[in-house]
């Protein structure tokens, strides 16, 4: 048994502490006989284990809270009546009760403790310790965070932040504590502790630490970004891909012709781009070996599937969304062949790509943005929310999520826009808005065409292509690109009647204008209105 002392966190009488277990040990633990309910993992034909997470098959943003105290009162971007977000306050008194529930659930149990790093740069990385009673949850964080070397573990010392996952505990008295339900995902930034109660969804542990990095890094003059990143084989040409869940971040950055830095969370400092994570968390609904070979091949022993349909013999049906559209796999980043080694970081990004899945069929498949448009569309963060990444959403609905990640922003959105644009201006980077959604055919733009567009951005051929302007939005769009169907580049050409595009375009332009009002409270925001759509 580990000599680790958990009493300093209030956890008493642990019957056994398994500290930094190996993958082999976790595999035995999560598939052993006698496990019940959501603790149980099932071995699949691909060698990966599948687990189910119950009613929570996505994050639960309504249950996310920060303790409001002297640390956070004037720094957190709190939710308000006029501009709602997920940063809801909870009192220090309520926190005591919430933490007590987690501590009592974990006390007297056999526990897993996993020590990780968040952030690939030694100068800014955090030591995060996860404590849980469920083997597959330990496996999940081992996949998703940076795994310290033996030597780094020997000198690990005290963590910078502690996460207690107590999925079996419920908050019965949630109303009197000012919470939303029996489920709670609560951060205390003074104590540097996160508590997760009554949800089994793995993504809460991953995204919790993203919210914390999003709090710390911009205050230290770094950009903190909800994006994927890759670089050329010689590691000289870096690109970053912003986008909300389901817009193609993982798919498009996982490119056999380039090296992956990471698929979801990155920082940008004076030296370049660095990953926060040590793994990938890919959506696997309708996954096929043909369309996404790298992700498909990453699903093997030590990968962990979530909420995928698997029959008694272990056969996987990736097309079945009866449990959720938000089926996932986590795997250590080295399951992808082309990655930046040994540390997931590279130089400055010259190409910045905003991915938007437009359900209206209005946006061009690619637009070259001016610096002012870059700020405007970054703050707008438009996409159509795609099925199932949050509870209760199954049809595409338009959404504006500041900085392509409002759910994870702990500070005001303009802070992230400032840091990003500062870094872009420093290196002369260009931004492109890429629509991975629908057009006038009623079908989604093909992965083949989107990949052709990304190739043209990365190899620079888009910057030499002839262009035209698109009305209302004043987007500069190429009229021809190698390997891309020329008939889709102007979205009007995909409609049987271009007047239908005009009607839809006016509607979408109006939504952009209305949404942007919330950013016009200061001069910087007011100045950007001119870069947006005009009716």
Swiss-Prot record:
Metabolic or biological pathway, per its Swiss-Prot or TrEMBL entry: Carbohydrate biosynthesis; gluconeogenesis
Pfam families reported for this sequence: PEPCK_ATP (PF01293)
Cellular localisation: Cytoplasm
InterPro entries attached to this UniProt entry: PEP_carboxykinase_ATP (IPR001272), PEP_carboxykinase_C (IPR013035), PEP_carboxykinase_N (IPR008210), PEPCK_ATP_CS (IPR015994)
Lineage top rank: taxon: Bacteria
Binding-site positions, Mn(2+): 207, 226, 264
GO annotation terms (biological process): gluconeogenesis
GO molecular function, one term: phosphoenolpyruvate carboxykinase (ATP) activity
UniProt cross-references to CDD domains, sorted A to Z: PEPCK_ATP
EC number, as in UniProt: 4.1.1.49
Chain sites annotated for binding ATP: 207, 226, 243-251, 292, 328, 444-445, 450
Catalytic activity: oxaloacetate + ATP = phosphoenolpyruvate + ADP + CO2
Co-factor note (free text): Binds 1 Mn(2+) ion per subunit.
Residues annotated as binding substrate: 59, 201, 207, 328
Annotated keywords: ATP-binding, Cytoplasm, Decarboxylase, Gluconeogenesis, Lyase, Manganese, Metal-binding, Nucleotide-binding
SUPFAM superfamilies, per database record: PEP carboxykinase N-terminal domain, PEP carboxykinase-like
Cofactor dependence: Mn(2+)
Protein purpose: Involved in the gluconeogenesis. Catalyzes the conversion of oxaloacetate (OAA) to phosphoenolpyruvate (PEP) through direct phosphoryl transfer between the nucleoside triphosphate and OAA.
UniProt record similarity statement: Belongs to the phosphoenolpyruvate carboxykinase (ATP) family.
HAMAP family recorded: PEPCK_ATP
Name this polypeptide is given: Phosphoenolpyruvate carboxykinase (ATP)
Species for this entry: Porphyromonas gingivalis (strain ATCC BAA-308 / W83)
Gene symbol of the encoding locus: pckA
């Amino acid at each position: 048994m580990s000599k680790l002392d958990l009493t300093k966190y209030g956890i008493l009488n642990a019957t056994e502490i398994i500290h930094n277990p190996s993958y082999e040990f976790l595999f035995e633990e999560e598939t052993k006989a006698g496990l019940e309910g959501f603790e149980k993992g099932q071995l699949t034909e691909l060698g990966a284990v599948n687990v189910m997470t119950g009613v929570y098959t996505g994050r639960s943003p309504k249950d996310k809270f920060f303790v409001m105290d002297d640390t956070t009162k004037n720094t957190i971007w709190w939710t308000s009546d006029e501009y709602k977000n997920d940063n809801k306050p909870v009192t220090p008194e309520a926190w005591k009760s919430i933490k007590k529930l987690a501590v009592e659930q974990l006390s007297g149990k056999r526990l897993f403790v996993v020590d990780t790093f968040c952030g690939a740069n030694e100068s800014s990385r955090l030591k995060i310790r996860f404590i849980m009673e469920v083997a597959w949850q330990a496996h999940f964080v081992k996949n998703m965070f940076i795994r310290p070397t033996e030597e780094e573990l020997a000198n690990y010392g005290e963590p910078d932040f502690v996460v207690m996952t107590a999925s079996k505990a419920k908050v019965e008295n949630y109303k009197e504590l000012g919470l939303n339900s029996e489920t709670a995902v609560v951060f205390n930034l003074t104590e540097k502790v996160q508590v997760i109660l009554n949800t089994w969804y793995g993504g809460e542990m991953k995204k919790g630490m993203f919210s914390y990095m999003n709090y710390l890094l911009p205050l230290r003059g770094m950009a903190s970004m909800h994006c994927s990143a890759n670089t050329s084989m010689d590691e000289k040409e870096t690109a970053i891909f912003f986008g909300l869940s389901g817009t193609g971040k993982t798919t498009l950055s996982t490119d056999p012709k380039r090296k992956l830095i990471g698929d979801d969370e990155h920082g940008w400092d004076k030296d370049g781009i660095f990953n926060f994570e040590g793994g990938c968390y890919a959506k696997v609904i309708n996954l096929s070996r043909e369309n996404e070979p790298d992700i498909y091949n990453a699903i093997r022993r030590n990968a962990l599937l979530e909420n995928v349909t698997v029959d008694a013999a272990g056969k996987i049906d990736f097309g079945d969304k009866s449990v959720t559209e938000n089926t996932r796999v986590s795997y250590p980043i080295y399951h992808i062949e082309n990655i930046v080694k040994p540390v997931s970081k590279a130089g400055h990004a010259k190409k910045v790509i905003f991915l938007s899945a437009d359900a209206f069929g209005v946006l061009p498949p690619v637009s070259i943005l001016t610096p002012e448009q870059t700020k405007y569309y970054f703050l707008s963060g438009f996409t159509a929310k795609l099925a199932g990444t949050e509870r209760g959403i199954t049809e595409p609905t338009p959404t504006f999520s500041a900085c392509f990640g409002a759910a994870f922003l702990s500070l005001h959105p303009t802070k992230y826009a400032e840091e990003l644009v500062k870094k872009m201006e420093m290196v002369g980077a260009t931004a492109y808005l890429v629509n991975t959604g629908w057009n006038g055919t009623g079908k989604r733009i093909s992965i083949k065409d989107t990949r052709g567009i990304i190739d043209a951005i990365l190899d620079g051929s888009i910057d030499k292509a002839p262009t035209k302007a698109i009305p209302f939005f004043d987007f500069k769009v190429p009229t021809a690109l190698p390997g891309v169907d020329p008939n889709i580049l102007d979205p009007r050409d995909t409609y049987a009647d271009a007047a239908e595009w005009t009607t839809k375009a006016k509607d979408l332009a109006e939504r952009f204008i209305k949404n942007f009002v919330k950013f016009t409270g200061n001069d910087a925001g007011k100045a950007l209105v001119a870069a947006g759509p005009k009716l």
